[in-house]
């Protein structure tokens, strides 16, 4: 069986939503027995659409020989979502908010690491300068260590 792609599941979900909307409209305009058959037909269509969606989203073992032909429409079995995003959606929150908060958190972490890196580089340079002045016989070794750790040579 060929793997089910993301676009197939997307189409199935759109069909389910469309059937729900049609049922909502039919219930809102319900006139009694004369519209009952139409409502029953719409409910049967919804049931069929849900069955199709369910069969398409059953967990299948991915085939070893199915190469990902279209990266913009991957097989549904290859898509993995972080549990945090699923929790956001379950809590009726926008997953874009999670993404924004995650990016901001990573940026703050990067700024912290950059500050630490700059502080250690400054400490390295001060230590090297002090060691050169206190122990001139170690000047070559100090210069080698400074170069190896990303610093420039100081004279």
UniProtKB/Swiss-Prot annotation:
Transmembrane segments: none annotated. Keywords: Activator, Nucleus, Transcription, Transcription regulation. Component of the Mediator complex. Belongs to the Mediator complex subunit 10 family. Residues 54-80 are annotated as: Disordered. One of its GO terms (biological process) is regulation of transcription by RNA polymerase II. Component of the Mediator complex, a coactivator involved in the regulated transcription of nearly all RNA polymerase II-dependent genes. Mediator functions as a bridge to convey information from gene-specific regulatory proteins to the basal RNA polymerase II transcription machinery. Mediator is recruited to promoters by direct interactions with regulatory proteins and serves as a scaffold for the assembly of a functional preinitiation complex with RNA polymerase II and the general transcription factors. One of its GO terms (molecular function) is transcription coregulator activity. It comes from Aspergillus terreus (strain NIH 2624 / FGSC A1156). This is Mediator of RNA polymerase II transcription subunit 10. The gene is nut2. GO terms for cellular component: mediator complex. InterPro entries: Mediator_Med10. It is found in: Nucleus.
């Amino acid at each position: 069986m060929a793997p089910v792609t993301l676009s197939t599941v997307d189409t199935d979900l759109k069909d389910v939503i469309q059937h729900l909307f049609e049922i909502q409209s039919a219930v809102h305009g319900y006139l009694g027995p004369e519209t009952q058959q139409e409502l029953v037909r719409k409910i049967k269509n919804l049931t069929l659409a849900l069955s199709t969606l369910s069969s398409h989203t059953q967990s299948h073992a991915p085939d070893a020989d199915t190469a990902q032909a279209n990266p913009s429409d991957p097989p549904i079995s290859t898509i993995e979502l972080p549990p945090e995003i699923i929790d956001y959606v379950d809590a009726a929150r926008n997953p874009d908010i999670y993404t924004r908060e995650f990016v901001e958190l990573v940026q703050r972490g990067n700024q912290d690491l950059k500050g630490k890196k700059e502080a250690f580089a400054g400490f390295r340079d001060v230590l090297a300068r002090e060691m050169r002045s206190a122990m001139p016989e170690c000047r070559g070794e100090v210069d080698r260590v400074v170069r190896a750790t990303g610093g420039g040579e100081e004279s």
